[in-house]
Amino acid sequence: MYVDPMNNNEIRKLSITAKTETTPDNVGQDIPVNAHSVHEECSSNTPVEINGRNSGKLKEEASAGICLVKKPMLQYRDTSGKYSLSDFQILRTLGTGSFGRVHLIRSNHNGRFYALKTLKKHTIVKLKQVEHTNDERRMLSIVSHPFIIRMWGTFQDSQQVFMVMDYIEGGELFSLLRKSQRFPNPVAKFYAAEVCLALEYLHSKDIIYRDLKPENILLDKNGHIKITDFGFAKYVPDVTYTLCGTPDYIAPEVVSTKPYNKSVDWWSFGVLIYEMLAGYTPFYNSNTMKTYENILNAELKFPPFFHPDAQDLLKKLITRDLSERLGNLQNGSEDVKNHPWFNEVIWEKLLARYIETPYEPPIQQGQGDTSQFDRYPEEEFNYGIQGEDPYMDLMKEF
C-alpha cells in the first residue's frame, strides 16, 4: 500500500508483528538498491547547509583512532580493480558534495542498476580525509547485513576513486521525515528497531559507525532501511580519540575530546529516535558551538506528546553518564531491545524482513526509478584519466 508522507494519519499505524506471508520479499537475494548524497565536509567547525539541514561535519583533528589493546584484525574483502568505467553506463547524478558525486549507473553486463560514488583524490588529501576514505572502503568490504548498504567493488583512475554500491530507490529517511514533519510513535519505533539491529551487527564486529542520522538512512523499494555512508565508520575494539560526526548527533564524550567507544552510537541512536518523534533534535541551535554547549550541559526535555516509554528509553540513551547509557552496559544491545518501548517488536521476524513496513516509497518505474531523488545539474566528467598519480600510495586498496 502506498501512502502520502505529507499526512501522518495515512502512514500505516503498524503494530510491529509478523507478516502472514511464509517468505519475505527478497530475503536471501541481492537487492539492487542505494544511492546517497555525498555530504559536504567542513574545513572548520562551520556548519554546511545541505538539503536545508545544518549537517556540517567535523573534520578529523586527531591523527588516527587509538586502540589501547590489540585484538585480531578483521578480514577485509579485496575490492580493488574489480570493475572499470567501461563496465557501466553513467545515467544521472543522484547527489553532490565537495568530494565528488554519486551517479546512477547501469551495468553493461547484467543490466542492473547501481550507485557509483566518486571521490576526488586531491580533495580527499587536501581535507585530510585519507584515513576516513580508506576506512570507508575497509568497513564496507567487511559488512553484510539486511539493513546495511552493500559495496560491490572499487576502482580508481589518476584523479578519482570509485565505489560501486547498491542503488536504493526509495530515497532518504530524512526526506520522508521532513515531508511528514514527525513520525507517529509506531512508525518511529519500526525504523528505530531496524537501525538497532544494524548497530548491534556493526558493534559485534567492533565497528563504530559514528554518523547516524536520517540523511544516512535509505529506504528500499519495500520501505526497509539501509544504512549508508560509512565515511566515519572505523574498526575500534577498545577506544578512539578521533573527533568527527554531525554536530546535532555527536555524543558529549566526543565533544569534550575524551576517549570513547561504541557507546557514542547509542547516544546518536537516542537522538535519532527523538528527531523522528519530535521533528527536531534535542540540543539543536543555529550556532554550532551553542549546540555543543547544549550537548554537554542542557537538560533533556520532551514534548508533551511523547509516550512515557519513549521518554524513559531516551533518558537512558541520551545520558552523559556512560555507566547508565543503554547499549554500553553489560548486556549491550540486549538492554536496548528489551526496553518496554520495543515490547511488541519480534526481533527475529524483523531481521528476516517479515514485518510489514509503515511506508512504501511510490516507485513506479521499477529498478532504476529516480523519482525519490533530487535533480542536479549534469556536468562533463573527466573520469578514466590515466597518468601521473601523486596519491597512488595513499589509496592503494582502491
UniProtKB/Swiss-Prot annotation:
Reactions accelerated catalytically: L-seryl-[protein] + ATP = O-phospho-L-seryl-[protein] + ADP + H(+); L-threonyl-[protein] + ATP = O-phospho-L-threonyl-[protein] + ADP + H(+)
Binding site for ATP: 94-102, 117
Domain of life: Eukaryota
CDD domains in UniProt: STKc_PKA_like
Keywords: ATP-binding, cAMP, Kinase, Nucleotide-binding, Phosphoprotein, Serine/threonine-protein kinase, Transferase
Keyword Lipid metabolism: no
EC id: 2.7.11.11
Record-annotated active site: 211
AGC-kinase C-terminal domain residues: 343-398
GO cellular component, one term: P-body
InterPro entries attached to this UniProt entry: AGC-kinase_C, Kinase-like_dom_sf, Prot_kinase_dom, Protein_kinase_ATP_BS, Ser/Thr_kinase_AS
Residue ranges of every copy of the Protein kinase domain listed in the record: 88-342
Modified residues (Phosphoserine): 15, 55
Regulation: Activated by cAMP.
Molecular-function annotations in GO: ATP binding; cAMP-dependent protein kinase activity; protein kinase activity; protein serine kinase activity
GO BP, one annotated term: negative regulation of cytoplasmic mRNA processing body assembly
Note: Present with 1590 molecules/cell in log phase SD medium.
Protein family membership: Belongs to the protein kinase superfamily. AGC Ser/Thr protein kinase family. cAMP subfamily.
Official protein name in the record: cAMP-dependent protein kinase type 3
Biological classification of the source: Eukaryota, Fungi, Dikarya, Ascomycota, Saccharomycotina
